[in-house]
């Protein structure tokens, strides 16, 4: 079990932490085995989740602090935008030691979600009863039921450390409006977030990658490996490296290279120490459209996301280049440097040499590689933003694998051994 930060941080960081914690509770590959995971039946029927890390420490007098998030499943089966939460408290008695605990709390009823949404807080074991949830891949949700029926909340935890005499029951979870305000750029309440009135933020992608996997959306006919699309996180890797492949790493490296050109030297180094809140605002500016992020009747969640991304690029035929160091900028800087150097050299030697005249022969025209019948040339650079995107640079030649009759669409292409989808209005056919 890796150590996670229990102190309140930006909602973007909370989403990364929540994604890591959640995979360690639901995937047998990241636990002690198939008998130590939250049952898929519980996950599929969950109406909401609370994911958080709590630190408890003390000697006679003890303190407790923790932070995380809450997210709700909407009526159409998709997930709401997350709301940041925190808990804290003091205690007295025969208590000694320290303990760091990751919690996943399954909200089994809409009433549990609505209670938090309405009040902005919820008391574990107070407003609604809470019980230890069933464990094991083949366990049923009824395994954690009380005498009066299934408990409104199931609790799962993993602990690092030793602490005697403290329970999370009775703790109050409170929404963190400061973190919500920072990410969503407004005074957004948990009620609006959990009811689906706010679009899913791009900063929560590490969390949605887990929530949109098969184990949270099982059908009766599902067979085979139901865990093969759960992202894998390595505890010895940096916090923002995700999934079984390195696509997220490539996106981060690409962004770092772009940023290094536009913010050089001391200015660049100082800007790297900016607060998380600025990052949150940037991430939310790329959030999905609410109307297209919801799954329509009979449609798939993937197709809804595709429609949303198509809409995004159909409205912007040219890429965002404001933070990138473009080819034209590089040429301009190079030309300026050469011109300055040449002027200095010739002025100092004007008594010895005269400037040569331009050649009379016409400039050669270098022909670009010709395109095949199923090939296209990239007119703009495209940095993929999600798994399955095909990233490319301006001028790259793309082999078209599948396409439609419209350029306001997403096509499938291949560059070398890489294959994925890309916006068709970024390329030009032969």
UniProtKB/Swiss-Prot annotation:
Residues with the Phosphothreonine modification: 316
Alphabetical list of CDD domains matching this protein: SH3_Ysc84p_like (cd11842), SYLF_SH3YL1_like (cd11525)
Name of one Pfam family that matches: SH3_1
Residues carrying Phosphoserine: 285, 318, 324, 326, 354, 406
GO molecular function, a single term: actin filament binding
UniProt region (Disordered), positions on chain: 237-372
A biological-process GO annotation: endocytosis
Basic and acidic residues bias spans: 263-277, 304-313
SUPFAM superfamilies for the chain: SH3-domain
Modified positions (Phosphotyrosine) in chain numbering: 325
UniProt keywords, alphabetically: Phosphoprotein, SH3 domain
InterPro entries, sorted: SH3-like_dom_sf (IPR036028), SH3_domain (IPR001452), SH3_domain_YSC84-like (IPR051702), SYLF_SH3YL1-like (IPR033643), Ysc84_actin-binding (IPR007461)
SS bond partners: none
GO cellular component, one term: actin cortical patch
Limits of the SH3 domain: 371-430
Compositionally biased intervals (Low complexity): 333-358
Family label: Belongs to the SH3YL1 family.
UniProt-recorded name of the protein: SH3 domain-containing protein PJ696.02
The organism of origin for this protein: Schizosaccharomyces pombe (strain 972 / ATCC 24843) (Fission yeast)
